[in-house]
Regions:
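Transmembrane alpha-helix interface motif
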Residues: 1-40, 46-52, 164-255
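Membrane-helix interface segments
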Residues: 40, 60-61, 147-149
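Interfacial helix-loop-helix linkers and transmembrane-helix boundary segments
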Residues: 44, 60-69
Length: 255
């Protein structure tokens, strides 16, 4: 279970001690501003501030880069699609293997706008994820009346995903010690065997876990975590942050 603590950051940072409900509501408000922003300046500002917060709470650069790699790829893809296949104002053109590609100025602006929204929204969620334990986040979602069945499924998936990861590491190390990944064909065959073993283990674990939970009185309803009262300082700080960012967004919209 050491994987559960592999992304533990600076517990002394004030952001990690803020109520998960306050952080979640603030993130939703800021996310709404980012998505509805008519320009790209505000989403980029939210992205920069969020990345700075992630670094401030002790998130390793490698972890941060891995977390942002997929949304960054999507943002770049959208930007390129908008640049070359959308718009009416030609910007520049070039040929590749006889294929003429024309970039459009208005398509570039639209692509930058969408890409900035993607990165701004992902960065806000990253701050909440890196600064909040998963169980506290699920408790906050339960307080927000998210369907309990979704929360239960997320908790089970989060808990037993690490067990499957440990099983995968054991099987992979055994295969590697037996030269199971020497060569492309042999490595592909070993990977298929690994995937099949994990599927079988997942079914076996689900049956044993279900039996154990029923024997311990599980009736389909997971007990909810008790929520502590809101702290006025945290609520006030969150309101000031949201209002301040809202004022900046409104100012840039007017300008």
């Amino acid at each position: 279970m050491h994987h559960l603590h592999s992304h533990t950051h600076l517990a002394a940072h004030p952001l990690t001690r803020v109520d998960a409900r306050v952080k979640l509501l603030s993130a939703v408000a800021l996310l709404t501003m980012v998505i509805s922003s008519p320009g790209s300046a505000f989403p980029l500002l939210a992205c920069v501030l969020s990345i700075a917060l992630c670094l401030a709470i002790g998130t390793p650069l490698r972890t941060l880069a891995l977390r942002f790699s997929e949304p960054l790829f999507i943002a770049v893809t959208v930007l390129l699609l908008k640049l070359f296949f959308s718009g009416n104002s030609p910007f520049f053109s070039f040929s590749i293997a006889g294929l003429e590609l024309v970039a459009h100025r208005d398509g570039l602006m639209e692509g930058v706008r969408i890409a900035s929204r993607i990165m701004g929204g992902v960065s806000l969620l990253a701050v909440v994820g890196f600064s909040t334990p998963f169980t506290d986040l699920m408790a906050a979602l339960s307080w927000l009346r998210v369907p309990q069945v979704l929360i239960d499924v997320a908790l089970f998936a989060w808990r037993y995903l690490f067990l499957l990861l440990e099983d995968a590491q054991v099987v992979y190390n055994a295969q590697k010690n037996r030269l199971g990944y020497v060569g492309y064909r042999r490595g592909l065959s070993s990977f298929g065997t690994l995937a099949g073993v994990l599927v079988i283990k997942a079914f076996d674990n689900s049956q044993s876990i279900t039996t154990a939970m029923v024997q311990r009185g599980y009736d389909g309803v997971m007990p909810r975590s008790l929520q502590r009262p809101f702290r006025m300082a945290e609520v006030t700080g969150a309101l000031l942050l949201v209002l301040g960012m809202g004022a900046v967004r409104l100012l840039w919209t007017v300008i």
